[in-house]
Amino acid sequence: MKVTLIAIPTCAAVLVLHTTAAEELEESQLMEVGMPDTELAAVDEERLFECSVSCEIEKEGNKDCKKKKCKGGWKCKFNMCVKV
């Protein structure tokens, strides 16, 4: 009986500590608000600019606008790089 009375609180304490550690790990893996968004926006703007400028140059040379291959999961659509 004494073993059962000791085991129950011990298991409860271990469960609480495990849950707390899991929550802390999850929070540490979440993206920070603000800073990464601005970095991604800058990358998006660069990709949009690169693709549209490339197509405009090709059009001025009396050639069909060939789609520029965007790298990293992006593709050129309507003179813009869009995420696939």
UniProtKB/Swiss-Prot annotation:
SUPFAM superfamilies: omega toxin-like. Residues 23-47 form a propeptide. It is found in: Secreted. Transmembrane segments: none annotated. One of its GO terms (molecular function) is toxin activity. It comes from the Eukaryota. GO terms for cellular component: extracellular region; host cell postsynaptic membrane. Its main location: secreted. Belongs to the neurotoxin 12 (Hwtx-2) family. 02 (Hwtx-2) subfamily. Postsynaptic neurotoxin. This is U4-theraphotoxin-Hhn1a. It comes from Cyriopagopus hainanus.
